[in-house]
UniProtKB/Swiss-Prot annotation:
Protein task: Catalyzes the conversion of dethiobiotin (DTB) to biotin by the insertion of a sulfur atom into dethiobiotin via a radical-based mechanism.
Note accompanying the cofactor annotation: Binds 1 [4Fe-4S] cluster. The cluster is coordinated with 3 cysteines and an exchangeable S-adenosyl-L-methionine. Binds 1 [2Fe-2S] cluster. The cluster is coordinated with 3 cysteines and 1 arginine.
Annotated S-S bridges: none
Keyword Metal-binding attributed: yes
Originating species: Cereibacter sphaeroides (strain ATCC 17029 / ATH 2.4.9)
Protein name in the entry: Biotin synthase
Cofactor: [4Fe-4S] cluster; [2Fe-2S] cluster
Amino acid sequence: MIRPALRTDWTVEEARAIHALPFPELMHRAQTLHRAHFDPTAIETASLLSIKTGGCPEDCGYCSQSAHHDTGVKATKLMAEEEVLAAARRAKAAGAQRFCMGAAWRSPKDRDMDQLCDMVRGVADLGLETCMTLGMLSPGQVARLKAAGLDFYNHNIDTSPAYYAQIASTRTMEDRLETVEQVRRGGIKVCCGGILGMGEAEEDRIALLVTLATLPAHPDSVPVNLWNEIEGVPVQGRARAVDPFALVRIVALARILMPASVVRLSAGRTEMSDELQALCFLAGANSIFVGDQLLTTGNPAAWKDRDLLSRLGLHIAPARARPPVAAD
């Protein structure tokens, strides 16, 4: 199948027109592009561990880990390396191909970089792909993580540029995009997506995807999150449940605008029916998080995911071979 050239010049008007297509046509276009770039029966798997929880100085209105909100989440210190590696071993045994480590920081301190790099090397030595989400990074920190063997860096832009000020005031969309660009220039693969259900309009969801699809290079992975109900955060008062078909349309639009990117169903799958997840896979989603816990929210039990994939005739994508990590 011929693969159309990837575009980074999408307009909101084009995306809006695609998003509004009759459902069968939208799904057909998304599935056609999905098949041009991926095995349509293969689902990638990742596992996520909070290596430093709570106490974050950012005031993101959706997040349980912000020090600005009274959510009952207690701040912890950075995990010890062996504790992280034990979790990585369990994740691999459960079928994860990638191990993501998240810390609730605005940005990591230089004093923590040695420990973070040791974690990356240790996880890579287990044969897992490595991913971190630590907040904003300096070019020097990007270089150190790259040298340690970090494969992916997650840094979501969360929502549209127009709606961003409604969810955070301690950082800007420009701050987020600057880190994404630093990571890309540093040779680490970019994982960047957003969150639905925070009170944003349909236009904001479309604009979020256009922002990602018009970056100098499309993100390698695009997580699609549904906001989870969290007591004590500002978003709680304006959050609205996302219509199931609206979610499928956004997944399909992500696949069409960024056909070579992995589209991951991330937070919120505990609220999705099997039928809704199946529609999302049909629309082009081809990755999930496995394991009972994400950062501070729940995730479907491993047996449920295995059962769902089996019933759909889908399989876990084979792990990619990773090159050996050079010693310091």
